[in-house]
């Protein structure tokens, strides 16, 4: 297996979800880091470069909407995917208003992985050899 090319930050306060995302996305040759809080995610984003964010809507120290707004301000142009159990249309609209690129309802992991592949295929990291 080659070195991972694209870097993903997954933010979810449920350890099992974070672990599952790390395993499944790593199998697709992505470098994956996880965070369980907004504070942890912002600290990682400030010191590392990511090509994509996967965010949960509910976090212990704020909302995914707040985090998405912060991340899009700190790192403009980096896509944010919401992967959340809150599948209501109002939440989807709020996520897009906060800067989300995509919104996938849990537990639809296949759609999430397809969305990650599609968004990262458009990024420079996917073209690196």
Give the ranges of each region predicted by the language model.
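Active-site beta3 strand of CheY-like receiver
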Residues: 48-54, 59
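Acidic catalytic/metal-coordinating carboxylates
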Residues: 37, 63-66
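Two-component/phosphorelay signaling modules centered on CheY-like receiver
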Residues: 15-33
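Alpha4 helix (beta4-alpha4-beta5 surface) of REC/receiver domains from two-component response regulators
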Residues: 66, 87-105, 110-114
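Residue-level signal for the "D+5" position in two-component response regulator receiver
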Residues: 34, 59-62, 97
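Non-catalytic signal-transmission and effector/linker regions of two-component phosphorelay proteins
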Residues: 1-7, 110-129
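Short amphipathic alpha-helix used as the core "switch/output" element in two-component signaling
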Residues: 65-76
């Amino acid at each position: 297996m080659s070195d991972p090319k694209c870097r993903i930050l997954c933010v979810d306060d449920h350890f099992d979800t974070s672990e599952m995302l790390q395993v499944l996305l790593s199998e697709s040759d992505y470098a994956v880091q996880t965070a369980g809080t907004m504070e942890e995610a912002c600290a990682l984003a400030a010191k590392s470069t990511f090509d994509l964010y996967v965010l949960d809507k509910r976090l212990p120290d704020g909302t995914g909407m707040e985090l998405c707004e912060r991340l899009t301000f700190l790192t403009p142009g980096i896509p944010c995917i919401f992967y959340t159990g809150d599948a209501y249309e109002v939440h989807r609209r709020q996520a897009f208003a906060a800067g989300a690129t995509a919104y996938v309802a849990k537990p639809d992991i296949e759609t999430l992985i397809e969305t990650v592949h599609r968004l990262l295929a458009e990024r420079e990291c996917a073209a690196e050899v």
